[in-house]
Amino acid sequence: MLNRYSKSLMNASQVGPERGDRRMRSGTTVSREHVFDRCGNCEIHGFALLVTQTGNARATIEVMATPQVLILQHVPWERPGRILSNLEDIGLETVTMNIVDKKKPDLPDFGELAGVVIMGGPMGALDYDKYPGLKAEAKLARAAVASGKPILGVCLGHQIIATALGAQLRKGDAPEIGFAPIKRVDKHDFFSMWDKQLTVLHWHNDVVGLPEGGQLLARSSSTKVQAFRIGS
């Protein structure tokens, strides 16, 4: 889902046939590999290419920054693990940040992000006074959903996204800690790679409702909303 840029090609112009030649011919396509092959010793970072055509004169190739997935990590022991491995496997670059204590965090340009991952943590999703960075994370979550940018929330991240979209947060009837089953309830088989019921690790006190427009994906005996999706 986050691999929308991994095979990016842009209609542009063809680099000339000789090594180091920057002349362009319109009506063809330039790929990252093509430019590496044709640019001699030049070093190119990223693979989204913008070619500026200058008539019959020489043209300029501008290399745009490689889109990154922003991973928001709140505590050292809640790491992205296999999420990070899978992102790397499909060729996406990532940047991991902890902004939980920062009122005005210096975040990457939103338009240049390929996606957002919000990890877990022991704080509450609405603990803005103690952890001011959570408010920035909620704002980022709303922007991602509104723009259709891929976003994934795990545990606390799931709660941050839900509350950012208007869902209610409350204490559960009892802490849910340890391995226990959840039931897949999605009607569109979004988690079709899993059994209808599977055992996962739980560690939370708070629970959230389903935000407006959300589709319920999984629940457990004590938590009605274990997973949901929203948007595209």
Predicted regions and their residues:
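N-terminal beta1-alpha1 cap of cysteine-dependent amidohydrolase-like domains
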Residues: D21, T52, N56-K149
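Catalytic nucleophile loop
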Residues: A144-Q168
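Pocket-forming structural segment of enzyme catalytic cores
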Residues: L165-S232
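Targeting/processing segments of secretory and organellar proteins
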Residues: V35-R38, I44-T52
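Low-acidity, Ser/Thr- and Arg-rich intrinsically disordered low-complexity segments
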Residues: N3-S13, R19, R23-S26, S31-R32
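Ala/Thr-enriched low-complexity intrinsically disordered regions
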Residues: A12, T28-T29, A48, T52-T60
